[in-house]
Regions:
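Polytopic transmembrane helical bundles with strong interfacial aromatic enrichment
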Residues: 2-145
Length: 145
């Protein structure tokens, strides 16, 4: 029986975490996209549907980025890959999540969720930083950190 070190166990956990998060967030994006295309048009204005679909698109792009991060995790500089994966998740929560909240506010006809748009750009910054860290992780030859 092969003994697994704590370090490789931790790396496997991170690798698996990014892949499972990416797969789950991708599935959720497909479901939300279907809802936006078929059900949402009946309850909110067209520009709100477009904002919602933008959130869905960016969620899907970054779910795929999480899958990529998990798949390349063992072959790149892991500290930067870890940071990239976390930034992608933060970006999905802030960017896509805020667009979903804005849509919910319009559907419920409440102004209390209108301020959610303030955090949307922060999610965009997290996405950009995530891609830059993924680039750095791929460029650096060392696998362990």
């Amino acid at each position: 029986m092969k003994k697994v070190s704590k370090r490789s166990s931790k790396n496997y956990f991170m690798h698996r975490r990014f892949i499972t998060a990416g797969a789950l967030l991708g599935a959720i994006a497909v479901a939300l996209g279907a809802f936006g295309a078929h059900g949402l048009k009946k309850i909110v204005p067209a520009e709100t549907v477009q904002a919602f679909q933008t959130g869905v698109q960016y969620q899907m792009y970054h779910a795929l980025a999480l899958l990529l991060t998990g798949l390349m995790y063992e072959k790149c500089y892991q500290k930067f890959a870890r940071i990239a994966g976390v930034l992608f998740m933060i970006g999905i929560i802030l960017f896509s999540g805020s667009l979903y909240l804005l849509t919910a506010g319009k559907a419920a006809e409440t102004a209390s969720l209108d301020k959610a748009g303030i955090i949307t750009p922060l999610g965009g910054v997290a996405f950009i930083a995530g891609w830059l860290f993924l680039f750095l992780a791929a460029m650096k030859k060392t696998g362990r950190s």
